[in-house]
Structure formats: C-alpha cells, structure tokens
Curated annotation (Swiss-Prot):
This is Bud site selection protein 4. Belongs to the BUD4 family. It comes from Kluyveromyces lactis (strain ATCC 8585 / CBS 2359 / DSM 70799 / NBRC 1267 / NRRL Y-1140 / WM37). It is found in: Bud neck. Keywords: Cell cycle, Cell division. The keyword Cell division applies. Residues 470-500 have a biased composition (Basic and acidic residues).
C-alpha cells in the first residue's frame, strides 16, 4: 500500500510535465537545446543518476537479507525506480498510455500550483535521438535535479475558479475515459512531430546553378586588339554541407549562434573580399524554426562576383595614349545587353557592371602585394609599363563558386611599327565597310566615321583593300530560380565586330595631336609677296571677303598654318620635338600675300559676317542657318535704328590710332628739318599723331620687315593712345560705317593736299578698324583708302573694308561748341582754300552730334539747387540813420526773377542781423546773381542851426559902456537840402553785389555749407554841388556826375550747392529744411532693435520660421535661430506701409482670404513691388514694440534722398565729393 501511494503521488508530476510539454509545443514557444545547457549541470545530473543506481543496488542486497516480505517491498521500490527512469527516455505514446491507465484511480488533485523561488523558466525541447525515439529533456531534468521550489496542491474547484477554465477541459481529453478514443488526438500528435521534423531539418533545397552573361570591362589603355565578346558565367549557390562541415568542428559555438541576435562578425566588410562560405547571419526579427531561413546571404552574394581564386592578369604594354585615340575608342563597343548593365542589387544599389571578373580574388588568396598591384598605380613621373602577355583560359584561376570564363585570345605585340599598324587598321576598317554595306545603320558605321575623321586628323591617306574582319557571335542565357517557383530563361544574341584601333604615337613629354608642330611654321615668304600691295589684315573675315578667288595668290585662310584651314588629306612632314630642343616661336597666323585693290568685292545683300573687334575666332564664321538668321536680324535693326546703331558702335569700339608716319614721294626728297605738326595744322583745328620722324618709321619697318607681328605692334601702340569721342576734321563725330572705296579719287585728293602744304611731312593716322594703310607702300609713299561719297542718313551696307571721311588724324572737340555747324564748316573751308574738292560733312554725324547734346540736356531737368542764407550786413557807412528813419531791403535777382526781402529798420549802431534765404535753380553751371540793398528814408523838414546871440549886460554906471554877453543856442530852421539825396538812386538803391557762380565755386560748396562774404558797392553816389544844393532842384540833382563805386558795407552769406543726380530727386526749399532732413536721416540711422520674430514670406514661403532679427537703421537682417548667421537682408527703404491690428490691406496688397485667416495676428510689411511679408512676435507686447519701431523707420523714408546721405557724410566725416 505504501508503494501504491508513492505511485499515486508521482502521477500528478508526470501529468504536469506531459501537459506542460504539449502546451509549449502547440504555442510554438522558443526552446533551448540541451546542448546549450551548461556542462556543469549535465555532469551533476549524471552524478545524481549514478548515485540513485547505487542506492537501488544497495537496497536489493538488503532485501535479500531481510526476507521475503522485505524483498517484495524492495522489488516494488526497484520497479518504481526503474519505471521512473524509463519514463525519462520513453516516447510520448508510452507516457500517454500510462496516464490513461491511471484514470481508473480516483483523482483527488487536478493540478499542482508551484510557488517558484527562482523566476528562471524551464523550457523543454525535443531532440531526435540516434535510435529514432523521442526524448524529453524535461523528464530527464525532473528525475535528476532536486527541485528548488515547494509545491502546494489545489483542488479542481479552485482550479476552475481561479485559473483558466479550459485547462481542465484539455486535461479531460487525456484523463477521462470517454475521450480516450478521440480522433483528434492522433492528428495533434502528428502535427507536433511534423513541426519537430521541420524545425530540425538540415537539408534545404538546393538552388539551381545560375548562368548569366556580362560584358567585359573596357581596359584603361585601349590597344589595337580589343575583344568585345560577352562573358558567360555559371555560378552555383553555396553548399549547405560545407557550412555544416565547417560548423561541425565548433559544434558548441554553432548551437549558440542559432538563436543569437548578435551578428557573426563584429566588423562590416565593405570591400567584399571576404569569404562568406562559413558565415550565417540572423536578423533581429527572424525565426529560427527552419534551417533554410538561417541562410541569410544577400542578393548579390548568390552570384559570388567577388569570390573565387582567380588570379589578376597583367595588362600588356601599350603605346602612349593620345586624346584622339581615346575619343575614337570611346565609341568602339556598344553594350546591347540589359541584364547586368542597368540592373542594381537590392542591398547596396551597386551595379553589377562595376565588378571586374579579371580582378575578383578570394579572401584567402589575396595578399597585401596583390591588393596593391590590383590598384595598378604607376610609378611617379613615368607611365606604367606592362609586359607582353597572352590572355587565355589557363591564365585565370577558377574559384569554387564560378565557372571558367572564356575569352577570345588577344595578342599584343609591342615590337610592331606604329605607322605600319596604323595603315593596317585603316585598310581593315575600309575593307570591312566595303564588304558589309548593309550594316550602314549599325553603330559600327559611327565608329567608322569617327575613324575616318581620325585618319584625316592624323594625315593618313585612304587605302582601299578588301579584308573581312571576323565576326563573333555570343550566345548568352540567364537562368535563375526565385523561391523554387519561377524559372526565367533569357537568351540574347548580338553581333559584335572586332574593332581595332590605330596605334598611338609615342609620347615624349608633351604629346602632339597633329602631325605638324603647333609652334613651328614653314617658311612661306616665297609665296608671291609684293611689298607695294601688302595689306593690313585685322581678322579672318576681312581676308575671306576681300581676297580674289583665284589661283594667282595663296589665301592665308587656306594655308597649312591657318587654324581655319580645312582638313587636308595630305599632311606635311611631321616633326618631333624633344624637351631640350624646344624653342618658343610665336605662331604666324597668316603671312603677307598678294592683295589687289581692284579685286575688292562690291557690297550686296549677300551673307557677310563682319565683326567690329579683333577676335580671331568668330562664332558666326560658319555659313549655317542660325548665323544667317542672326545676320538678317542685325541688318533689320540697323535699318530701323540707323543712328542708334552708329552711336552704339562708337561706344562699344575703343578707337585706336596708327602711329604711322607717311613719307612723301621719294626718300631722297625728305626734309631733314624737324616738323612741328602742331604748327602745321593748328589753324585747321586738327589733331595729328605724336611726332615721329620718317627715319624712325623706316628703320622700324626694316627691322620688322621679315616679321608678321609688325601690324600687331602698331595696333597695340595705337590702342594705348586712342581716345573716345573722336571728331572728324570738320568737327563732327567720326562715321564708322563703310562704303565703296574709290582709290583713284583718294590718291588725287591726298596729292593735292600735300601740294598745298609745300610738300611738308604730314602725319596720317586713324582707327585700326577704319583706315587701311598699306605697309608695303610706305617705302615709296603712302596710300590711304578713303571714300569721298556723301553719307546718307540711312545706315549704309557693311563691308569688310572700313574707312573714315578724312585723311587726317582727328582731334578731341573743344569745350566751347561752335554756334552753328555752318559757320564752323565755312571756317574750315577757308583754311583749305587749295582743295578743289573739299570733303563734305556727314549728315549722320551732324544729326548724331545734335542728338547727343539734346540727350545730355534732356536727361536731367537742371543741375541742382543753390541755397543762400543772408546772415548779416556789417560796416555800414551811413550817417544820421535814426533821424532819417531809414529802412532797408535786399533785392535778389538771378536774371529771370527778382525777389525782395521785407523792409526792416536799420539799427543805428552795430551790424544788421538778417535771416533771409534764397533758392536758385541751377539750369547751368555758370550763373550770375545780383543782390542789391535798398534804403527807404524820410528827409527832415527842419534843421537845427547853432546861433550866437549878444545879450547886453546892465550898466553899473548910467553913462558907462554897454557890455554884451554871447550865448549860443540852436534854432530850428527850414532844411534847404539833404545829404542823403546825393547817395541813393531814384529807386532807393544804395549798394549792390554781383556774384558770378562757376564750377570752381560750386565745387567748394558742393554738399556742404560755407560762409562767404560779399562786398556791397555804392554805384549811385554823386558829386556835391553847393549851388544845386541851394536851389535844391530835383531834376538837376540826378544829372550830377557819379562818384567812383566805393565799398559801403559787406554781406555775410551761407551757401550750399546740391547737384542733381536723378530726375526723381527732390530738394527742399531752403537750408533750414536741408538741415532738418539731415537730422531725420540721422535719427533713422540711429534706430536699433533686435529680437526673435516669426517670418512668412520673402525667402520663407508656405511656413512660419523663427528667426533672430537685428534692425540697424533701414536694414532688417534676419539671422538663423540657432547659429545666428545672417541669412536675409530686408531693405526698409522699399517698404511702403505697415499693416498691423485694425488695419488691413485691400486690392493687390491682399493676397488671398486664407492668408487673412492664418496670419491675422501678424503685422505685414508692404513693399513697393506689392510683395507682402508677415511677421509675428512671441508676445503681443513685443509685437507692439516692433510695430512702433518699424513704423517710425518707414515714416522717415521720405527724408531719404540721394543728396541727404552725401550731406550727412560730409558733415560727419568731412568727405569731399
């Protein structure tokens, strides 16, 4: 009975472990392999099992000694122990049958509730043993380990009340007899076993080998034999057996890595030169139930493009590379495959075309030296030199995951002559083109056309020989399997010709792109040079349109030395230059050739592209449709705006004068005396070239006779001495329009001029683009191309030959313009009396001169404002001022208007204080002002006269002498005349001052106030005549002779001049307003504020951005909120108004209704271009402060005129403008 009780006590534990194992397997919880348990725990369990066996053996021996009854008891204990041991290794079916057998006994306890002392869970995992039986790790642990917890039995009622109710229902399937034959139970067992098998399955399905075709990488240095054959590669997926074999050596580490969330390797391989056969990567969210899912190779790892043990082949020794060969090789092969050339991998988005099969090396085979050699870095200061080799299939090692790649054999021979190879390649290409005419539309024809251009550039003649180039056909297919469901096979076929490039010329220091040397020109002086007709050529266009089309001369534009020559099929003898023998020589663009004046082409409406500058490369030199359209537009504009075209031409082109001296008739007749060119033509108002003797010109010509840069030196020297705004001899602007050339009339006219000047040496010069002086004729005389025809108002047709209307050098016009062009022309005609055929003045030049004068005057309405402030009158020489009750006024006269100041009393003593201001509108820089002092007085009617009276003294004695006493007294008498009547004019004028305003004076008072003193002179005082004074006849009084003007007082005045710089500029009325404007400007500049504002608009659109704003005067600078770096500057001078609370914008100033809703709390800045920028502050108080400050700044904008800033700077910093 005791043994049965023990068996019943063990039954709940067995059922608990069984049900717990079923629940855990159904819910697919994570399991831990027994191999992952610590070795110490395993050893302890084995020791405990051995100890239990020893106890059982001892028990048996004791049972033999005690007797039958005790032996039976021992046997039961042994059976129980053996049963327990057997349960630990029994499969699930045996345990379940045992549990069903126990169902007959009454069940007192339905479940066991454990109170764990340690929270470490116990997870079971089923393993497949060698004999095929299922073993539970939990059963082994339960039988061998001592439990570290205490158990408390609970009844079935408590289990239903406090725990999940369906637990008992699940137990009933195993404990109740009515559910013993449940058909779902075998299905459940089968599902569990199937899940165990799939979880421990180690043989994943192997992928089929992948076959794909890639295009070979183009070599860095193209050689004459370049294969464009596609490469077909077959790749096998990594074998799982190799992975398992590699993991078998480290079984414990492999088992630990199965459920690890940490990557296998701590470093990340970025160069992909690492062998990945033994690596298994598990992501953080992946499951480890399936071993196939543990294979986490990346997409590109399946192809093993970078794995393998292939050796890096060495490149052949190639000839020097030039630019032309590189251009021709860039189009030799066209990739027709779209498999790997455009596809990118899923992981790193790296094109598969970037991998080079010839450089793929495994990790175990790549050494440090090999990695350095793979970079192919040449030695410094020299080109890489590669040995000759032969590329075949045996020269490449085969990796474990890649099939052998077959290449066409390419042989490189460095001993072959370069010139012979070039001819052979050209012959092969021409023969291929002739033999395959149907391939004209293929990309090869483009290559052939490119090679044809290369042949022309290299100067190789065309050779026609038939030679068929072999064709290689490549079949490529790509097969791969996606998740075992898709099989996609693509076949591509492409014809690829074997394209051979011409060998490159050797590179010695600086390689040449042409057969001929750029810095070595052949001597062409034998090509029909005539010194008497050598022409001054300024650009290529004039050469093309002026030379005669024929075989009598050689055009420099078609010369072998010209940059614009057509590509010649026969090249000149090539010359090789080394670094030591190189000597710099300026390139000769064109040499002197025969140039006949009579062969000039008359102008027509044909397509002629002429330039006004000295550009050697004219972008319109080609006769294309676009250039014709541009030329037609230029002609149309010239016809519509003839004078504007002339004006623009004068402004755009810098005039330059030839410093050339002309020698008369014969050299022997040249005068030895020095010629004063200023005295020769000074009466003609002509400006000549700087004096230069004929000997200097002739010697310079002989020194530079064999050089073609003589003209360039003269042109450069003339540019330095050139001036703008040149005039012709008759005082008008030079006309740069061209016309027909009458050489005979020109020569006749010049001869007549020289004859009238007594055959003195006359220096002739003009603009380099206007006058053509034949340098060759300077030996015998001079020859000038000049047109004597009158120029119409319309723009004449342009011609490659340009001229001016005078043979003399022009001179800058004088400051004082002539009153009438007719009078000026008449004076010039009188000077040139000997001329029978005087040149006429160009009507276009006259019109342009008048229009320029009108333009200067109409641009600004005046020259500014002149302000005068009268301060005081000092040292007034006038008596009895108080008796005459005198008053004064100042009369101001500017020649157009007369203004009088109010009448004021004259103080008897001291200076007269004044505060009167005048404004003068300066219509010119020379203005005369008159200020007159007038006095109004009252002549006295009576005059106090001193009288001496004798007053008798009373006698003492009656008969004494009478004595008198003298007494003086003043007696009022009638005034006969007044002294002031001889000092004033009839209108009361007493003194006058004349102020001559000129440029010097304006310069002293420009943008600043100066105190000036002007003397008043009395010009009306007459001589005193006593007779006339006695009679006092007024008519006779004014007939008296006047005295010489004398100084009677001085006037102190503050003067300022504000010149006008803009027609929209506004000036105040007086100096007081000027000072007030300057004060307001200073007040505006002193406004400062800073803080954070939210901005929307301007450079911030569609959002509110917080910025740190700094206000300095009229500049609002927005800084970054964090870094405080300036980002935007807002000019508040352009702000028209500010809209804040209670003030809204209407019309164009309001953008839309949405802005009103979203930015209703913001204040807005309205600019002159109707742009609105919204601002808002962090609080209403800060917002109100910003609005007040910005409003004051905007209101002061009206005081911001151009002159205010200059006046302010002058007062503050004493800057003179």
């Amino acid at each position: 009975m005791q043994m049965e009780d023990k068996g019943e006590a063990l039954n709940p534990d067995a059922m608990y472990s069984l049900l717990k194992e079923i629940d855990q397997e159904i819910s697919h919880t994570d399991n831990i392999s027994i191999d992952q348990l610590p070795e110490e725990d395993t050893l302890d369990n084995e020791k405990k099992i051995d100890a239990s066996e020893n106890v059982i053996e001892n028990t048996e021996e004791e049972a033999l000694q005690l007797g039958d009854e005790s032996a039976n008891t021992t046997t039961e204990i042994k059976e129980t122990s053996c049963t327990e041991d057997h349960d630990t290794v029994e499969n699930t079916e045996d345990v379940i049958s045992m549990a069903e057998g126990l169902d007959k006994a009454p069940l007192e306890t339905a479940w066991i509730k454990h109170n764990y002392q340690q929270t470490k869970p116990v997870v079971s995992k089923r393993l497949i043993s060698n004999d095929g039986s299922d073993t539970s790790v939990e059963d082994i642990n339960a039988s061998t380990r001592i439990p570290s917890y205490t158990s408390e039995e609970i009844t079935g009622l408590e289990l239903k009340d406090k725990m999940v109710t369906d637990v008992g229902e699940r137990l009933s399937h195993f404990l109740d007899q009515k559910y013993a034959e449940n058909p779902n139970l075998p299905a459940l067992k089968g599902m569990l076993s199937m899940a165990d098998e799939k979880a421990m399955e180690d043989d994943p399905k192997k992928d089929k080998p992948l076959v794909f075709t890639i295009e070979p990488t183009k070599p860095l240095f193209p050689s004459k034999e370049v294969s464009s054959t596609m490469i077909q590669v077959e790749i096998h997926t990594p074998d799982e057996d190799d992975v398992d074999g590699a993991a078998a050596d480290t079984k414990e580490a492999t088992n630990l890595l199965l459920d690890s969330k940490i990557p296998v390797t701590p470093n990340v391989c970025i160069n992909r030169f690492v062998n990945n056969n033994g690596e298994t990567r598990v992501s953080s969210g992946s499951s480890t139930e399936d071993a196939q899912e543990l294979n986490t190779h990346r997409f590109q790892d399946r192809y093993h493009l970078l794995s393998g043990a292939q050796a890096v082949p060495q490149l052949p020794q190639l000839p020097a590379l030039t630019l032309q060969d590189y251009k021709s090789s860039s189009v030799q092969s066209v990739n027709a495959s779209r498999i790997f050339s455009v596809a990118t991998t899923n992981d790193n988005y790296q094109s598969a075309k970037e991998y080079d099969l010839s450089s793929t090396v495994g990790c175990e085979e790549l050494s440090d030296d090999a990695s350095v050699k793979d970079l192919e870095i040449p030695e410094p200061n020299e080109l890489p030199c590669f040995p000759t080799f032969q590329l075949d299939s045996t020269s490449m090692k085969t990796s474990s995951s890649m099939e052998t790649v077959q290449h066409d054999k390419a042989k490189f021979n460095s001993d072959v002559n370069i010139a012979d190879d070039t001819m052979e390649q050209i012959e092969q290409e021409e023969a291929e083109l002739i033999s395959n005419p149907e391939r004209s539309g293929s990309p090869t024809n483009d290559n052939m056309s490119q090679h044809s251009q290369n042949r022309q550039l290299l100067g190789v003649s065309e050779v026609s020989q038939a030679q068929q180039a072999p064709e290689h056909h490549v079949e490529m297919s790509v097969e791969f399997q996606d998740e075992g469901r898709r099989d996609i096979t693509s076949s591509f076929s492409r014809e690829s010709d074997r394209i051979e490039l011409p060998p490159l010329p050797p590179m010695n220091g600086l390689s040449t792109m042409f057969d001929q040397d750029l810095f070595n020109d052949h001597e062409t002086s034998h090509e029909s040079i005539d010194l008497t007709s050598s022409s001054h050529k300024e650009n290529y266009l004039s050469i093309w349109h002026s030379q005669k089309t024929g075989g009598s001369f050689i055009s420099p534009a078609l010369s072998t030395n010209s940059q614009f020559s057509t590509q010649s099929r026969t090249s000149s003898v090539p010359t090789n230059h080394s670094g030591s023998s190189f000597k710099f020589k300026s390139r000769i663009i064109s040499n002197s050739h025969v140039f006949k004046q009579e062969a000039f082409r008359q102008f027509s409406d044909e397509y002629v592209l002429s330039t006004q500058d000295d550009s050697k490369l004219d972008p319109l030199r080609r006769n294309t449709i676009m250039s014709k359209r541009i030329q037609q537009e230029l002609k149309t504009q010239a016809k519509m705006y003839p004078f504007a075209n002339k004006f623009a031409l004068d402004e755009s082109s810098e005039p330059s004068i030839h410093n050339e001296s002309i020698i008369t008739g014969d050299i022997s007749r040249t005068s030895d005396k020095a010629v004063d060119t200023t005295n020769i033509l000074s009466h003609k108002n002509l400006t000549l070239l700087p004096p230069q003797s004929t000997e200097t010109v002739f010697s310079s010509f002989l020194d530079n006779f064999d050089k073609d840069d003589f003209e360039e030196k003269l042109a450069e020297e003339s540019r330095l001495n050139s001036k703008k705004n040149l005039q012709t001899t008759w005082g008008h602007f030079r006309d740069v329009s061209s016309g027909n050339v009458d050489i005979k009339a020109t020569q006749q006219q010049i001869a007549e001029v020289l004859h009238n000047q007594n055959e003195d040496v006359v220096q002739v010069g003009s603009h380099i683009q206007d006058v053509k002086v034949l340098l060759g004729n300077e030996i015998e005389g001079y020859d000038v191309q000049k047109s004597v025809s009158d120029l119409s108002v319309e723009t004449t047709k342009k011609s490659p030959i340009k001229h001016v209307g005078s043979p003399f050098k022009v001179k800058a016009r004088s400051e004082t313009p002539p009153q009438s062009p007719v009078v000026y022309e008449r004076d010039t005609t009188e000077v040139n009396e000997g001329l029978q055929r005087a040149p006429t003045t160009s009507l276009a030049s006259v019109y342009l001169e008048n229009s320029l004068q009108e333009f200067e005057s109409s641009e600004l309405q005046d020259h500014g404002k002149l302000y005068l402030k009268l301060k005081s009158i000092n040292s007034l020489r006038l008596q009895q001022i108080k008796r005459h009750n005198a008053k004064y006024c100042i009369e101001f006269d500017n020649g157009k208007e007369v203004i009088e100041t109010p009448w004021e009393s004259i103080p008897e003593d001291g200076p007269i204080k004044m505060s009167q201001e005048f404004e003068v509108n300066m219509e010119s820089n020379n203005v005369t002002l008159f200020m007159t002092m007038k006095i109004r007085y009252t002549s006295p009617q009576n005059q106090l006269t001193e009288v001496v009276e004798k007053i008798p003294i009373k006698k003492r004695f009656a008969f004494g002498k009478t004595k008198y006493r003298l007494e003086k007294r003043f007696v009022t008498k009638k005034l006969k005349y007044d002294d002031w009547d001889f000092k004033f004019a009839k209108d009361g004028s007493f003194a006058r001052c004349q102020v001559n305003v000129n440029k010097n004076m304006l310069k002293q008072i420009k943008y600043k106030t100066n105190e000036l003193h002007f003397e008043f002179l009395n010009e009306w005082e007459r001589e005193f005549d006593e007779k006339i004074a006695q009679t006092y006849k007024e008519d006779e009084l004014w007939k008296l002779p006047r005295k010489n003007p004398s100084k009677v007082c001085s006037l102190t005045v503050d003067v300022m001049y504000l010149p006008r710089t803009s027609s929209m500029e506004r000036f105040p009325k007086n100096l007081k307003a000027v000072q007030k404007c300057c004060e307001k400007y200073l007040e505006q500049q002193r406004v400062n504020n800073e803080g954070f504002l939210w901005q929307e608009g301007g450079d911030v659109e569609g959002m509110l951005k917080r910025r740190y704003m700094i206000l300095k005067g009229t500049e609002l600078i927005a800084h970054d909120e964090v870094t405080r770096k300036p980002q935007t500057l807002l000019n508040l001078l352009n702000v028209v108004d500010i809209y804040s609370d209670g003030k809204t914008a209407t019309g164009k100033q309001m953008r839309n209704f949405t802005d009103m809703v979203l930015f209703s709390d913001c204040f807005k800045l309205l600019f002159a271009n109707d742009e609105v920028i919204n601002f808002n502050a962090d609080s209403n108080l800060l917002k109100q402060q910003w609005v007040e400050i910005l409003t004051s700044v905007v209101e002061l904008n009206k005081f911001h005129q151009p002159w205010i800033k200059r006046v302010f700077e002058n007062e503050q910093y004493n800057i003179t403008f």
